[in-house]
Amino acid sequence: MANVIKLRKGLNIHLKGTAAQTKRVVGACTEYVVRPDTFEGVVPKLVVHEGDRVDVGDALFVDKNFPEVRFASPVSGTVKAVERGERRKILGIRLQADEVQKYHDFGRRDVSSLSADDVKNALLEAGLFGYIYQLPYAVSTNPQTMPKGIFVSALRDMPLANDFEYELQGNERDFQTGLTALSKMATTYLGIGKNQKADVLVNAKDVEVTVFDGPCPAGNVGVQVNHISPVNKGEVVWTVDPTFVIFFGRLFNTGKVNLLRTIALGGSAMASPMYVDALIGTPFSVILKDALTRQEDLRLINGNPLTGTKSCLEDSVGVKTSEITAIPEGADANEMFGWIMPRTNQFSTSRSYFSWLMGKKAYDLDARVKGGERHIIMSGEYDSVLPMDIYGEFLIKAIIVGDIDKIEQLGIYEVSPEDFALAEFVDSSKLELQRIVRQGLNMLRKENA
């Protein structure tokens, strides 16, 4: 029987526009754009040039620091252009897709008979190893490290999050194959929610299943690592998004790379919130054609409202695009007397409004911050929504002043920026906590290089 871990700290935010469990397949488009900067910590080095032909699974670029880590093309076709920014930074690789897709055949493999090196080499060869992330630093992993464990969280509980049980339908065999492959490299832990009932999750083979019972962010893999096997200095764990586990399984079951993923279209500015199947690199302009209720005063988010990034129709599906969210920008909002006026249609984590009496009522929130940055107030706000054994407020202050010794002592090795998403939401100081944590992780990584 699976171990159950109960969490009390956290906050569930119910928003209008949850994706209905209906799906449409995005039709083939002529151009795809792969953006290397969506792979955190990777310094891309191109291995293709304009005019080159590639098949699905061929490498487009490698990590300059670890050249054996390749990144696969999601489609076959011709490299149409390489988009660059300041100092020739690679912003995107634009691919002109073939009408009939051609796949690089890596050969089917029975994962039960493979060694750890066989699995690692197969993922490296197919350009999928870079989808594995590591703690500390929350970056694409170093293939030369040996993790003490591999963690997969199948629980997505952020606002408007993609329901992985729905995404899993039809992919059960590939998911189990992917888990078995990971278990060859290290002890693998699968975290699920108490309400998840899919047999391949509850009775997953070759992994240790842990049930998490509690509010958001119980689904964050960093939270699960903190409660199962905390990361100390000198230790490394790998983390894998459950969608990428499916990618790995497809590789071993078919011998081909298939980067088709299920994406939730959510938010109050979506005409019909639903799911779509789209390849990595698919432009948002294709996915969101006729899908939005407005074009003005719109905040388009690549991801969910808490951890996603501000986006636009020229963006494309990336490594973290499990959701595309559309909410009002709020620039045209005019509220008489502001927060002083009692309201029933506003959400509050305190008792300023009546939301604490409304149960699971869904709210139509916009993108306004409603205030500027203020001094940090040591009020315990972060701790109320951070179910980890760390001192969040002290850690943030130590990062801001650049105290390396202090941030190590305060537990930065086992956190990711997303672990502070809720703390950022409730923060009365209006600080960009996720950005601060990312800066701290990058600073520590550079110090330890």
What does each of the following model-derived ranges do?
Residues E68-S76:
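Short coil-to-beta-strand transition motifs
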Residues D58, K64, V75, E83, ...:
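Glycine-rich, histidine-containing beta strand-loop boundary motifs that form or position
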Residues H49-V62, A81:
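Short, well-structured beta-strand-loop connectors
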Residues M1-V47, V62, F212:
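N-terminal, Lys/Arg-enriched amphipathic/low-complexity engagement segments
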Residues V69, E83-V286, D290-A449:
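Buried, small/hydrophobic-residue-enriched core segments of structured protein domains
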Residues M1-L15, T22-K23, K80, G85, ...:
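Mobile cofactor-carrier "swinging-arm" domains
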